Amino acid sequence: MGKQKIRIRLKAFDHRILDQSSEKIVETAKRTGAAVSGPIPLPTEKSIYTILRSPHVNKDSREQFEMRTHKRLIDILEPNPKTVDALMRLDLPAGVDIEIKL
């Protein structure tokens, strides 16, 4: 595998498990001899939902909820087959969305 790059995008609502997952991926890639760039923090996506507090009247009384999606980007440069195999066997916590591009 010459001059190839694996790009991994991680998304999660909780930044702590996102950082733990990215550290696991970086450590695994470095242990197998690949060069790693990252984890690079990407902008946090914030979704705001506004609802009425009352089921009947009082439109002026509203409540807002927000959901933050934290993102990280990891580039693995010059991966070897051992790196790919180790990443496939890696066990990451639930709640982390992983997107891998070769």
UniProtKB/Swiss-Prot annotation:
Give the protein's function.
Involved in the binding of tRNA to the ribosomes.
Instruction: Please list the disulfide bridges.
Output: none
Q: Which organism is this protein's natural source? A: Heliobacterium modesticaldum (strain ATCC 51547 / Ice1)
HAMAP family attached to this UniProt entry:
Ribosomal_uS10
Secretion signal span: none
The UniProt GO MF terms for this protein read:
structural constituent of ribosome; tRNA binding
InterPro entries, from UniProt? Ribosomal_uS10, Ribosomal_uS10_CS, Ribosomal_uS10_dom, Ribosomal_uS10_dom_sf
Q: Which Pfam families match?
A: Ribosomal_S10
Q: Which UniProt keywords are listed?
A: Ribonucleoprotein, Ribosomal protein
Gene responsible for this protein: rpsJ
Recorded hits in PANTHER family, A to Z, give: 30S RIBOSOMAL PROTEIN S10 FAMILY MEMBER
What is the name of the protein in this document? Answer: Small ribosomal subunit protein uS10
Assembly notes: Part of the 30S ribosomal subunit.
